Each structure stands twice: as structure tokens, then as C-alpha cells.
Regions:
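Extended alpha-helical targeting/anchoring segments
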Residues: 1-532
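C-terminal and late-domain segments of enzyme folds
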Residues: 2-4, 43, 80, 672-676, ...
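Active-site-proximal beta-strand elements of phosphoester/diester hydrolases
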Residues: 203, 330-333, 656, 693-697
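N-terminal beta1-alpha1 cap of cysteine-dependent amidohydrolase-like domains
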Residues: 3, 505-595, 599-605, 612, ...
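Generic structural signal for residues in well-ordered beta-strands
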Residues: 559-561, 625, 673
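Catalytic beta-strand/loop cores that center a nucleophilic Ser/Cys/Thr
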Residues: 451, 643-691
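Cysteine-nucleophile active-site neighborhood
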Residues: 573-649, 653-655
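Active-site flanking residues adjacent to catalytic metal/cofactor-binding acidic residues
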Residues: 366, 538-539, 697
């Protein structure tokens, strides 16, 4: 281990801080921290997702912090979790004594309890974030420990959805448990930071020098006292009382109700959800590691909140991030399932970007988000710096906007946070009406879902993620809530499916049934149909011949590639079971293709042509070629076939790549057209009596990869040759 330079500084209140740093083992430190959170209070925030200019990979966390902040409704309790916390409490009590938002404040050696004023002065909408709330109290705590000397010290934890009711007048319909907590934050004094870009993990240790309850001098120090805490082992549940808070068909009914609100103009969009329940038999740390490995995200988290309550998060969405005066958010709206491979992903991305419904979703979300920022930002400073950008996760593809602004000098990070409470992407628009719909129509309280997780720094900065794709584990039961963004274009059945798709990765992580969404690529195609087959490919100076050759070799064909003159000599002298006429530039005549075909016919060798190869076969048998009005170079077309053996197992309509300027104008009677393109061009032929087949499109192209169409076609060619060879050998 390596000890780094110590730093010392004074906070705004005069509290003295000494920070030392120790380098830990990069490979094991974070995993050990995660394991300790199964039984001890603390937080691990983990960003395992990268996006240029937005997200990098890092971990930050701690265990056994000295102080815990617990908010319930209009009350807050600040608990010392060990003797080190008891030393800090008097300073916090002093900081809160003049807070106008507090109606009653009580201090004791091991805790501070307070309640908020029931009525406060009226504020303009621009100053709503200054309304008396638990955040008024947090603002005083932050001011007490304020210093620009350290970027890590601060408050870490979870902000519940119900905190919004301290700012917005929403009529309550849900039945809530009085023991439920709206806010749980920790003030740590030992913070582990892992930077995955440099492969280094540092443990920062903090010591404080404070004043006692009745002292005016800073003489009380945490130095010399152990960082201890009470262990409370995780207790799993074996079963749940229900699988979902919605009965079959109920969520679809909620969507249909929302459509009526849209038609009347009461809402533009709304984001209701449903909750799924699973017995969480494995520990939260185990579930977290599964989720982190299989569902990387920018706002992953494992939190032991005490009272047998844990949060396991893989959130894809930034809530609010503040750095100095700059405030930014990344609203997500627009979702589609990932494809089976990279080609499938590309198709899905195209579908998503072409979806008017998904574009409307995100546009409305970003307009509301810009409005939230305009409450606290300098006029004209709010800008959309990224529009409908693609972010890809284990099972889902999202469209994301990136919005930045610069806050007015009179506002701080908490103002920026509160101006967005809560994000339009989990509520709707207009926001107040959407929250009222959610409160009235959802089947259970949201708890932490739709709130935020993260860090409020004593340096004035803030980094929080939206609490979604998050498992709440309470008394051994995993609660997984997922929502769908509804608007007038919504299909009720599809929206219900989307909630289940979003929840699926978390449910599988709880069950231990990990499935990759894509990410590992398509299965490598191979078959043994070509064993014993010797093929010769004539290279017509094309740039794709080796891709085509690889497809045949994946079918176990022994293949040799030669330029035309050498190929004709080889044909005369060697045994060849299949002649492949490759694509190429120019015309068949340029490569004397008629001479090549002549030799193959004399020796009774089956022929398969691609692109230029098809054109050469057509010309050899008396057909004509013509020039396309517009060249098809690197273009994908929809191809329709008529069911020949060449297309066995291939959909009657499929997409394939084209690279050609010439096309068959007339096809002689001895050749049969077996496939055409959407522009009615000849795309495949076969001889009426001889083993000759050809395609105009490129089966080896990336544009022909969907559903492994190109591979299957080549397999069919090889299978046909193998069958013919077997029949000849049997004679």
C-alpha cells in the first residue's frame, strides 16, 4: 500500500478537516466494499458505462459512516452511528439553530431530531426551491462543512419520490406506511474511489476537529476512534405475497384511461408504472455484481439503508449534475429492444430513430426539462448539446438528449436539483397534472422509484442519477418498478410489454438467470456440408472475394482463389467440384468469363456466380445486359424469391446488399429468374437443367447479414453441390 500526501483545511464553520490517502488493491477493494454492504450501512456508487463528454467509469463508496440522515414527511433525524458521529453532531446542531425552516429542534448526544414549519412564506415560482423543506436543512449542513478543498466529502444516499410533495400540492390517494422513509443520506469519513481509466483505487480517510455541545473552542477530534458500526446480516425472504401490484390487464386499462386525458388536453404525456415482486434469496451484493456485469450503467448503486432495506441500481439516466455553475441533465425517452447482434441493433436503431411517437416522447420531455432549468438558469444559457443520441444497454436501446445551462449566481446545486423534482421522464407533462394522475392511478406508492440517488458535495457540486432500473429490497423481498412513457400515440398492449421488458434484466438478476441482451455478437455460423468439396473461386479483382471465400470455408469447403487466367489453367488440370464466379468491376468480357464458363461446362463442374458472375452467365447463354439508371453501390434492397432450393430456409422477402451498375436486361429461356428486387431487377437465376446458379446481390455483404441470410444462401449452394457429388459417386 502507498500513502499519499495529506491535506488539511477549514470548513466555512471553522471545523478542521485532515485528509490522508492510502492506495488499495485495485482488483479487490471495491468488491470487498460491496460485500460488506450486505451487513453494514453504507453506499457504493458505480459508473460502469462510458459515453464521450458525458460518462466515465468510476466507483465511489464507503461503509460504516459516522452519520445518517433519515427523513420522513416533515421530520428529520440525524443519527450518530458511532462515537465519531457523536463528535460531529454538536457542529450540525449549531448550524441548524437559526434555520427558519425548522419549527422544533432537539439535540441529544447520539441524535438530532427536528420538524419543519407547517406554513412558510409565499414564494414566487422562480424561488419555489427555497420553500421550507428537508432540503432547507440539508442546505445548512452543506454550508457548515463547505469547502472547495475536497471533491468527495459530502452527503450520499437516496431521495424518495414523495419528497416532491414538499413543493407541489398533490392530493394523496395512496396508502402509505408511516415507517417508510423519504430520504436516507450518509455523511462518510472514509471514502474509497476507484478510477477505472487509470486502474487505481484510493481510500481517503477524514479526521475532524470540532466543538463540543457547550464548548466554543475546536478541541474535540475524531482522531484515534475506530470507524465502527453495527452489523445486521441480510435476511432473505422465501416467498412473496404477490407477483405484481397490477392484476392481468390492469396496466393496459391505465393506459386507456391516460388516452382519455390526452384527448381532453388534461395531459400531454404521463409515465405510470407497475411493481413486480420477487423473493430475493441471494444477498444484495450478489445481485448487484450480477447487474453490474450484465447491465452496465452510468448510475449503478448498492446501498444498505438500514432497517433491512437495500437499493440495487442500474440506472441509465442522469437526474441532475452540477459542476460549479453549470447544470446538466440527460433526459431519456424512446425505447426499443436490442437486436440479436450488431446488424439487428442497427435495424432497431433505424426503427427507433424513424419513430414519430418516440421522437414526440423525447421532444416533450426535453421541453419540460429546459423549462425546469430556465427557472434557475441565466436567460439564454439553456442549450440542447445532444439531440436524440443513442445509448445502448444490455437489453434496451434509448434515445437521449443532453441539456446544459448556467445557473444564476443566487442559486446553488440544491436549487438546480429541486427545480427538476421530479424528472419529466418519470412523471410527465404538464408535470403537476402528471404527478396527480400517477398518485391517483398507480396501485402502490413509488417509494424510491422516480427519485434520485447520488452525492451532494460539500464543494458545492452535485451528481445524481434518476432512481429507475432499481431494485428495492425490503425485508428480503425485491421490488422492481418499471414505467412507460404514454402519449396520444401509445398502444396500450405495447406499453405494458415495455414495462416488463425494462424490468426483465432486474428480475433475472434477482433470480440469477442472467441473459445477455446482445453485446456478445451473433453466433459464428458454421456447418459441415462442404466436407470433401474442392472449390475454385475466380477472383475478378473484387474487394469482397475473401469475405465470400470465408463463407464457403465456414461450410467446410476446401477453396482456392485464383485470378482469371490462372483459374482457367487450374480448371483444366485439377479436380474441381464447384466453380465460383466472384463479383468484380467492369464487364464479364473484360475478364474473358465466357472462356472460364466454357471449361467448367466441358468438365461438368457446377457453377455459382455472384454479381458480375451472374452477368457473365446471362451473357454466356445469350442474354443481354444494360446499365442501371442509377448505380446500386453499397445499397440495401428488399429481395423477393420464388422458393427455389437456393433460398431454402430464407424468408420470401429479405434484405441484401448490392454493388453493381449493370443488370440483366433479357434472360434466355434456359435460365429461370428465381428472385427480383423491389425495383424489379433480376436478383437470382438458375439453369433449367444444369447445376448453375447465380445471384446479383452480395450474400457476403454486411447488408445481407440480417437473420444470417447470406450464410444460409451459401450453405444452400454447398448442400446442393454435396448432394450432386454424392449422386455422381453412387453411379
Amino acid at each position: 500500500m502507498q500513502t499519499n500526501t495529506q491535506i488539511q483545511y477549514k470548513c466555512a464553520s471553522g471545523v478542521q478537516v485532515r485528509r490522508s490517502a492510502v492506495q488499495l488493491d485495485y482488483q479487490t477493494a471495491v468488491d470487498q466494499l460491496a460485500a460488506s454492504l450486505d451487513h453494514s450501512p453504507g453506499v457504493l456508487l458505480a459508473s460502469s458505462f462510458e459515453f464521450p463528454g458525458r460518462y466515465t467509469r468510476w466507483d465511489i463508496g464507503f461503509v460504516n459512516p459516522p452519520l445518517q440522515f433519515i427523513g420522513r414527511g416533515n421530520s428529520l433525524e440525524i443519527k450518530a452511528l458511532n462515537i465519531r458521529g457523536e463528535i460531529l453532531l454538536p457542529e450540525i446542531y449549531r448550524a441548524l439553530q437559526d434555520c427558519k425552516a425548522i419549527e422544533q429542534l432537539d439535540g441529544a448526544p447520539q441524535s438530532i431530531s427536528l420538524s419543519l414549519v407547517t406554513e412558510s412564506e409565499e414564494f414566487s415560482e422562480e424561488l419555489r426551491s427555497r420553500k421550507a423543506s428537508l432540503f432547507s436543512v440539508l442546505r445548512e449542513v452543506i454550508a457548515c462543512f463547505a469547502s472547495a478543498s475536497d471533491p468527495y466529502l459530502g452527503l450520499y444516499g437516496a431521495f424518495g419520490y414523495d419528497l416532491t410533495f414538499q413543493f407541489e400540492d398533490v392530493i394523496r390517494y395512496q396508502t402509505r406506511n408511516a415507517e417508510d422513509r423519504d430520504l436516507v443520506l450518509y455523511l462518510p469519513d472514509q471514502i474509497i474511489v476507484a478510477d477505472h481509466r487509470v486502474g487505481k483505487t484510493i481510500c481517503y480517510n477524514y479526521e475532524f476537529v470540532c466543538r463540543g455541545w457547550d464548548a466554543e473552542k475546536f478541541t474535540e477530534t475524531t482522531g484515534g476512534f475506530r470507524r465502527s458500526g453495527v452489523k445486521s446480516p441480510y435476511v432473505p425472504a422465501l416467498h412473496t405475497a404477490q407477483d405484481c401490484d397490477h392484476k392481468a390487464g390492469e396496466f393496459v386499462e391505465r393506459v386507456e384511461q391516460a388516452l382519455e386525458y390526452f384527448r381532453r388536453g388534461d395531459l400531454f404525456e404521463v409515465v405510470p408504472g407497475q411493481t413486480f415482486y420477487e423473493p430475493c434469496k441471494d444477498s444484495p451484493a450478489t445481485v448487484f455484481q450480477r447487474l453490474k456485469e450484465n447491465n452496465p450503467s452510468p448510475y449503478g448503486a448498492l446501498m444498505n439503508l438500514g432497517e433491512q432495506e437495500y437499493l440495487v441500481a442500474a440506472s441509465p439516466e442522469m437526474f441532475v449534475r452540477v459542476d460549479g455553475r453549470q447544470i446538466e441533465t440527460c433526459p431519456i425517452s424512446g425505447t426499443i429492444k436490442r437486436g440479436d447482434d450488431a446488424i439487428g441493433d442497427a435495424t432497431q436503431i433505424k426503427t427507433l430513430l424513424n419513430s414519430a411517437k418516440d421522437e414526440s416522447e423525447l421532444s416533450m420531455c426535453t421541453d419540460v426539462d429546459r423549462n425546469d432549468k430556465s427557472r434557475v438558469c441565466e436567460p439564454g444559457s439553456v442549450r440542447v448539446v445532444g439531440r436524440r443520441q443513442i445509448e445502448m444497454y444490455s437489453r434496451l436501446i434509448h434515445t437521449v438528449d443532453h441539456v446544459k445551462g448556467y445557473m444564476k449566481a443566487e442559486f446553488d446545486a440544491l436549487d438546480g436539483f429541486l427545480a427538476h423534482t421530479w424528472a419529466v421522464t418519470v412523471t410527465g407533462a404538464p408535470k403537476l397534472a402528471a404527478m396527480q394522475f400517477i398518485e391517483q392511478q398507480e396501485k402502490s406508492p413509488r417509494h424510491w422509484y422516480g427519485g434520485a440517488i447520488g452525492h451532494i458535495g460539500f464543494d458545492g457540486n452535485l451528481n445524481t442519477g434518476l432512481t429507475l432500473r432499481t431494485i428495492r429490497v425490503k425485508d428480503g423481498v425485491a421490488q422492481i418498478r418499471a414505467g412507460a412513457t404514454l402519449l396520444i400515440d401509445s398502444d396500450p398492449v405495447e406499453e405494458e410489454k415495455e414495462t416488463r421488458l425494462k424490468a426483465s434484466a432486474l428480475i433475472d438478476a434477482v433470480r440469477g438467470q442472467i441473459k445477455s441482451g446482445q453485446g456478445k455478437g451473433a453466433e459464428v455460423f458454421s456447418c459441415g456440408d462442404g466436407l470433401g468439396i474442392k472449390a475454385l473461386m475466380v477472383d475478378h479483382q473484387d474487394s469482397f472475394v475473401h469475405n465470400l471465400a470465408a463463407y464457403f470455408r465456414q461450410c467446410s469447403v476446401e477453396l482456392t482463389t485464383l485470378r482469371p487466367e490462372a483459374a482457367r489453367k487450374y480448371l483444366k488440370d485439377q479436380r474441381v467440384d464447384l466453380l465460383i464466379l466472384s463479383p468484380g468491376p467492369s464487364t464479364p468480357e473484360h475478364f474473358a468469363m465466357k472462356a472460364t464458363i466454357e471449361i467448367a461446362l466441358e468438365k461438368g463442374i457446377p457453377i455459382f456466380g455472384v454479381c458480375l458472375g451472374l452477368q457473365g452467365i446471362v451473357e454466356y447463354f445469350g442474354g443481354d445486359l444494360t446499365q442501371l439508371g442509377y448505380p446500386m453501390h453499397g445499397k440495401q434492397s428488399l429481395i423477393t424469391h420464388q422458393g427455389s432450393a437456393l433460398f431454402a430456409g430464407i424468408a420470401s422477402e429479405f434484405s441484401a446488399g448490392r454493388y453493381h451498375s449493370l443488370i440483366a436486361k433479357t434472360v434466355p429461356a434456359c435460365l429461370r429468374v428465381t428472385a427480383t428486387s423491389e425495383d424489379n431487377s433480376v436478383m437470382a437465376i438458375e439453369h433449367q437443367s444444369l447445376p448453375i446458379q447465380a445471384v446479383q446481390f452480395h450474400p457476403e455483404s454486411i447488408m445481407s447479414l440480417e437473420n444470417q441470410t447470406g450464410h444460409r444462401l451459401i450453405q444452400n449452394v454447398v448442400a446442393g453441390v454435396a448432394k450432386l457429388k454424392s449422386m455422381q459417386e453412387a453411379v
